Regions:
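C-terminal alpha-helical "lid/dimerization" subdomain adjacent to the S-adenosyl-L-methionine
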Residues: 6, 146-200, 210
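A short glycine-rich, Lys/Arg-flanked "PGG" loop and its adjoining helix->strand segment in the class I
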Residues: 123-135
């Protein structure tokens, strides 16, 4: 496990059962809507691999929309919560996104959420994710964004002031998340602006790549089709 993955696991594993409820609250109720939009980018039907599945929120939405789902995550703590959520109804695999123990072209589609900020080589990871998708299938991602224009100062105030303060009030690991998240998002987009990220997608063999910014740019959904 690399240092970045270590940091991510140390941050999020202690959140446990509070992750879903408090995470939605800290996004001002937007996170569930973002996840629904992510899933809506896929064509209907088929078997979806949900990478960085966490507690299974995206996987649950995929099932609700009629997909078969397999979840992958590096954290045993998060997978334990997902297992309780699904009661064995969704296969769950503990694995790293950059080394999936899966055959090429073994899934119809693939989703991933809040992943590329935590890997050493995002471009190589995206190649590995696309490897397991059948030609014609979709890959879709959800990541936090950095709003521009009039929304930018409000976002900076929220992630720089409100989130850390809320984390201190909530405790149980949320203090560290509140302190970390804003800087992590800002640094990712500074190092990897959208044009660079789109180059990763094209380099992974994905075509027709599209981008939608949600909630004034607070979230970014990217999706494309495996050539």
């Amino acid at each position: 496990m690399n240092r970045i993955e270590d940091q991510a696991r140390e941050l999020f594993s202690p959140l446990g059962p509070t992750y879903d409820r408090v995470g939605a609250a800290l996004s001002l109720g937007q996170d569930p809507r973002w996840r629904r939009y992510l899933v809506s980018r896929l064509s209907r039907g088929g078997h979806v691999l949900d990478v960085a599945t966490g507690t299974g929120l995206v996987a649950a939405e995929l099932r609700r929309r009629g997909f078969d789902v397999t979840g992958v995550d590096k954290s045993p703590e998060m997978l334990a919560i997902a297992e309780r959520r699904f009661g064995g109804g969704v296969p769950l695999i503990r694995a790293s996104a950059d080394a999936l123990p899966l055959d090429p072209a073994s899934f119809d589609h693939l989703t991933f959420t809040y992943l590329l900020r935590y890997v050493v080589d995002p471009a190589a990871t995206l190649v590995e994710l696309a490897r397991v998708v059948r030609p014609g299938g979709f890959v879709a991602s959800l990541e936090f964004g950095v709003p521009s224009g009039a929304a930018g100062p409000l976002w900076s105030l929220y992630v720089g002031g409100v989130l850390p303060l809320a984390g201190r009030v909530l405790r149980n690991g949320w203090r560290e998340v509140g302190d970390f998240l804003g800087g992590s998002i800002r640094d990712f987009w500074r190092r990897h602006p959208l044009d660079r990220q789109l180059a990763w997608w094209h380099g992974a063999g994905l075509s027709g790549v599209e981008v939608t910014r949600l909630s004034l740019g607070g979230a970014v959904v990217i999706w494309g089709r495996k050539a």
